[in-house]
Amino acid sequence: MDNAVIVHYHSCKGHYFQLSLWQWRDGKLGKDAYFSRFDSFGAVAYLTYPAPYFLSHAYVIVKDQFWHYQTVDFRIERDYGVPKTEVWLVDGDPTVYYSRQAAVASRHYGRCDVHAFDMAVNSQAFDKRWGFSGWLGFRYQPEETSFRLWAPTAEKVELILYASTDERASVARVLPMQRGQQYSPDHHAENTCGVWDISLRGDYNYHAYCYRVYYRRRTFRDTRDPYAIATTANGKRSIVIAPEHLRPQGFSVKQGKEATWRLDNPNQAVIYEMHVRDFSKSETSGVSLANRGKFKGLIETGTRNAFGDSTCFDYVKSLGITHIQLQPIFDHHQFFDDNGDYAYNWGYDPENYNVPAASFTSNPHEPATRILELKEVIQAYHDAGINVIMDVVYNHTYSSRESAFQLTVPDYYYRMNPNGSFQNGSGCGNETASEKEMYRKYMLDSILYWTNEFNIDGFRFDLMGLHDIDTMNLIRQELDKIDPRILVFGEGWDMGVGLAAEQKAKKENASKMPGIGFFNDDQRNAVKGAEVYGSFEKGFVSGAPTEGLVAKSILGSDELVSYCTPSQVINYVEAHDNYNLNDLLWVLNPEDSKQDHVKRVQLASAMTILMQGIYFMQLGQEFLRTKLYPTGQDKELTQADRERAGYFCLLSRIKRL
């Protein structure tokens, strides 16, 4: 493995020609290395640190030939999975910078610009100057299409149009965009000085496009539109589609009293979490081969297994649940197997937030198909009286450096450290900054798009504790204007250090967010036990003395956390993360008979569904789904599985009484 590092070095005096580098890694002797070119920052060197494995860090010194001059030892931290690390070093400054803008703000830099990194470290002033509250993306009409991109730090932006919607199509036209001229820091609807736009006469339906953003005169990157609603199959180019081409037959958006499937009392909700691919991928599902693992597999009817029992959509309709929750259905990073087919992926790798995932559609190369098919799914569940909740992941992006956000306005949309590295409260390499005006706007615009365009009935926020309270309350307020019965809840874990504790949308701050729900891990652990970093703890159903916590959970958990109402409490004993209930109880009680084991599972589910609050479960929990081994021969449901599912069906009906 090369473990490549690009080093940019700036000398205030401009003395470069006598300089070289000394590079090394732990446990190995060092060697000389040399600068190979110059750029506007200074000298540039391309280094490799060959090793049979990924290096988490490496070292370098800048020196002259005889070591009369040398810098401090620079330790370069490398992000796992990123093949090439780029750093900026400044003469006299011991800091390793991971952003050019952060390095230019160093007082040791020859042409120091103290405001160069304001978008990261002084965002309130940056937002006041550059914030914009108008529409972004594209607006289509048959006679004219307009494009808008917010890119205040860009020196120039061009619109790139492609010859077709094929991901390999050649460039057809390159058109200059114009920067807005109006500066209005107190009225952001009119503050266009950071917005680039262009209007094109003619019909641009089904045209692929991207933006070419120039950071400096000759330095640019091409990026998809952050506000894209359709993309090429690989997600790298955006596509204009006329609204009338995105309405499948029979689909209609209904809100308020017209949305008769929504619940007036959220505490009656029974939420059923599932993954699009998992739902129908098995050959035992009875779903037609073409639809297995796809959006269409969610609604195919008449499916049966080898025993003649109803499966998939027909089965879900028989359960008595009120909501399904779909694990991420937006466009996420795509992995492929050896045959070039889409590989299994939970979907928590966001790339295009407003675009349905290509891997779930019958034809990823036809950009409207995935939109139409997802709308057909939502309509079918609404017709069956079932709400559809969307699992959203606004807390991080798959790539830090290659996301549309970073390519458009570098270092703005994320929480950054002073040295230009990304904060990583998500554990995924970065965390977004919901407290900044334009990412808050993006989150809200995206949520409203899914609500108004797809008729989504609720949103489950992944790692919600990384978002700020004001943003989450704003989302709740705007959804209330549409329909207050739309659910908003999430993972209120305390993660990251980028926000003050009192600003985090974590469960300990539940009283500050009265219309938002939180997963109740206190109740979960008290009832079933827990697996924490490889160690296991028993809960009530395994004989642990947690009666006090269980009693408080039954009464609404407000003595455990400052919940305002039971509807803020999401009670559960199984979700897609960690051990399934069935597996955990086998680990905690390995000597149980099958009969005793089933009774423990049933007790955990029954206790939880009858507690005050909203009930949440994972697909298959009702028939002892396992992550470790199949329950029946050839992955078939056994008679015992069907009996257990029947037991849950009774419980779900009790919940709605």
Locate each region found by the language model:
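Short proline/glycine-enriched turn/loop motifs at strand-loop junctions of beta-rich domains
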Residues: K13-F17, A151-V157, D577
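Conserved alpha/beta catalytic core and glycan-binding cleft of carbohydrate-active enzymes
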Residues: I241-L246, R476-K655
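Short, surface-exposed loop motifs enriched in S/T, G, D/E and P with embedded aromatic residues
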Residues: L29-F38, V171-G194, I198
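Non-cytosolic beta-sheet module surface loops
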Residues: Y9-K13, W150-T153, G202, P328, ...
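Hydrophobic faces of well-ordered beta-strands that scaffold small-molecule active sites
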Residues: V270-Y272, I324-L326, V388-M390, F459, ...
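The feature marks proteins involved in alpha-glucan
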Residues: M1-K13, D39-S146, H188-E273, D278-G297
